[in-house]
């Protein structure tokens, strides 16, 4: 591996600079939407949520330290990450409620209010699952909390509950809207697909949360993209769910002020699972599965890298127990790290990739 420790840093490798540029980009996107898209009011929820989340995180992180909520770093991970041991985790507990509470206040009556309540509930539910997982990791002083099967079961139960309420209310379309006026009719298959989306997206965002500011920055951009495409759809857009997306984007921007390199706190499973659940809930209620798939391209790549790595290793494993590896290490961000690219470079590059996927998702958004 290339030695990068003594190499001079470029300006984009400064965590404060790169995080500030990301925040400016998200703000510019919301301002542009408010100026040119009818009925768009994305900036105010963004600013309120960002400010409150940043303040709550600033007040809460010292408390996490006092409670000894220090992250346990996995031994088999990159050696450079061992210096992160002891950094407070469970940061999602500080900012996810901010996004859901501010988002829930956008509409207080009618179907919009009910949908906001449902999305907030599934987001907080996954936050609790992630929190339980983080807590078990901390109390056991290992990098693993819940068993994979146990975590999957809890995620599935929460997803089924959300889908049952949505089915009862008739909120979810049985077809998936695609670009160019195409639709994919699924009928009853939309329900197993919906559960798969919750499981896949929440675990993809969880896998992405491996470098300082990576998941929080990517999440803020994807929430912005989802909000803008919601306002561009139909005649009046979907101001309520779009506003919720912006409060979640703001929550992660506020957290990024403390999660940028060098991170003062990690979101933990508490935050990453909640992020994926919020995106999934919004996508299912607004028939935005296609935009989420495209805009979350980095999340998808991180998840696929793990699936490919495990599959190839198992299928090529010999008598000595060793198999081939496609990547130096999975998820994908570790592959670049072990190739000699610094964490400070990988993160803004993944942010730029996410911004590109968001723009592509806006260009290829469904028209209905």
UniProtKB/Swiss-Prot annotation:
Instruction: Tell me where the signal peptide lies.
Output: none
Q: Which keywords annotate this record?
A: Cell cycle, Cell division, Cell inner membrane, Cell membrane, Cell shape, Cell wall biogenesis/degradation, Magnesium, Membrane, Metal-binding, Peptidoglycan synthesis, Transferase, Transmembrane, Transmembrane helix
Task: Name the Gene Ontology biological process terms.
Answer: cell division; cell wall organization; peptidoglycan biosynthetic process; regulation of cell shape
Q: Does the entry annotate any disulfide bonds, and if so which pairs?
A: none
Location(s) in or outside the cell: Cell inner membrane
Q: Which GO terms describe its molecular function?
A: metal ion binding; phospho-N-acetylmuramoyl-pentapeptide-transferase activity; UDP-N-acetylmuramoyl-L-alanyl-D-glutamyl-meso-2,6-diaminopimelyl-D-alanyl-D-alanine:undecaprenyl-phosphate transferase activity
GO cellular component term, pick one: plasma membrane
The residue stretches assigned to a coiled coil in this entry are none
E.C. number(s) listed in UniProt = 2.7.8.13
* Catalyzed reactions per annotation: UDP-N-acetyl-alpha-D-muramoyl-L-alanyl-gamma-D-glutamyl-meso-2,6-diaminopimeloyl-D-alanyl-D-alanine + di-trans,octa-cis-undecaprenyl phosphate = di-trans,octa-cis-undecaprenyl diphospho-N-acetyl-alpha-D-muramoyl-L-alanyl-D-glutamyl-meso-2,6-diaminopimeloyl-D-alanyl-D-alanine + UMP
**Domain of life assignment:** Bacteria
Q: In which pathway does it act?
A: Cell wall biogenesis; peptidoglycan biosynthesis
Membrane topology according to the record: Multi-pass membrane protein
InterPro entries from the xrefs?
A: Glycosyl_transferase_4 (IPR000715), PNAcMuramoyl-5peptid_Trfase (IPR003524), PNAcMuramoyl-5peptid_Trfase_CS (IPR018480)
Cell division is among the record's keywords: yes
Q: Which cofactor does it need?
A: Mg(2+)
Q: Where are the transmembrane segments?
A: 11-31, 42-62, 88-108, 112-132, 152-172, 180-200, 211-231, 237-257, 265-285, 293-313, 346-366
What PANTHER family does the record tag this protein with?
Answer: PHOSPHO-N-ACETYLMURAMOYL-PENTAPEPTIDE-TRANSFERASE, PHOSPHO-N-ACETYLMURAMOYL-PENTAPEPTIDE-TRANSFERASE HOMOLOG
Query: What does this gene product do?
Result: Catalyzes the initial step of the lipid cycle reactions in the biosynthesis of the cell wall peptidoglycan: transfers peptidoglycan precursor phospho-MurNAc-pentapeptide from UDP-MurNAc-pentapeptide onto the lipid carrier undecaprenyl phosphate, yielding undecaprenyl-pyrophosphoryl-MurNAc-pentapeptide, known as lipid I.
- List the NCBIfam families: mraY
Q: Which family does it belong to?
A: Belongs to the glycosyltransferase 4 family. MraY subfamily.
User: By what name is this protein known?
Assistant: Phospho-N-acetylmuramoyl-pentapeptide-transferase
Gene from which this protein is expressed: mraY
């Amino acid at each position: 591996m290339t030695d990068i420790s003594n190499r001079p840093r470029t300006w984009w490798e400064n965590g404060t600079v790169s995080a500030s540029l990301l925040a400016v980009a998200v703000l510019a996107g919301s301002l542009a939407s408010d100026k040119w898209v009818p009925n768009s009011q994305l900036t105010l929820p963004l600013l309120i949520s960002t400010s409150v989340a940043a303040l709550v995180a600033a007040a809460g992180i010292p408390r996490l330290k006092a409670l000894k909520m220090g992250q346990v770093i996995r031994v088999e991970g990159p050696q450079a990450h061992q210096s992160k041991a002891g950094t407070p985790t469970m940061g999602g507990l500080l900012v996810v409620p901010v996004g859901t509470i501010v988002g829930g206040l956008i509409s207080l009556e009618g179907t919009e209010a009910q949908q906001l309540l449902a999305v907030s509930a599934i987001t907080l539910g996954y936050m609790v699952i992630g929190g339980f997982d983080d807590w078990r990791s901390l109390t056991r002083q290992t990098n693993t909390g819940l068993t994979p099967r146990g975590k999957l079961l809890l995620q599935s139960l929460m997803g089924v509950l959300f889908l049952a309420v949505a089915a009862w209310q008739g909120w979810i379309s049985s077809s998936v809207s695609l670009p160019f006026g195409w639709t994919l009719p699924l009928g009853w298959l939309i329900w197993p697909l919906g559960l798969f989306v919750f499981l896949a997206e929440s675990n993809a965002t969880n896998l992405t949360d491996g470098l300082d500011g990576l998941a929080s920055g990517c999440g803020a951009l994807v929430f912005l993209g989802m909000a803008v495409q919601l306002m561009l759809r139909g005649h009046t857009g979907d101001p309520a769910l779009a506003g919720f997306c912006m409060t979640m984007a703001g929550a992660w921007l506020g957290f990024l002020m403390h999660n940028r390199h060098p991170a003062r706190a990690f979101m933990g499973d508490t935050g990453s699972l909640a992020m994926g659940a919020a995106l999934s809930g919004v996508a299912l209620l607004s028939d935005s599965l296609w935009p989420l798939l495209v805009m979350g391209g980095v999340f998808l790549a991180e998840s696929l890298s793990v699936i490919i790595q495990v599959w190839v290793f198992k299928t090529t494993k010999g008598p000595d127990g060793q198999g081939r590896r496609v990547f130096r290490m999975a998820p994908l961000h570790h592959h670049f790290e072990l190739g000699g690219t610094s964490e400070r470079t990988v993160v803004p590059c993944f942010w730029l990739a996410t911004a590109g996927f968001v723009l592509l998702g806006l260009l290829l958004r469904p028209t209905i």
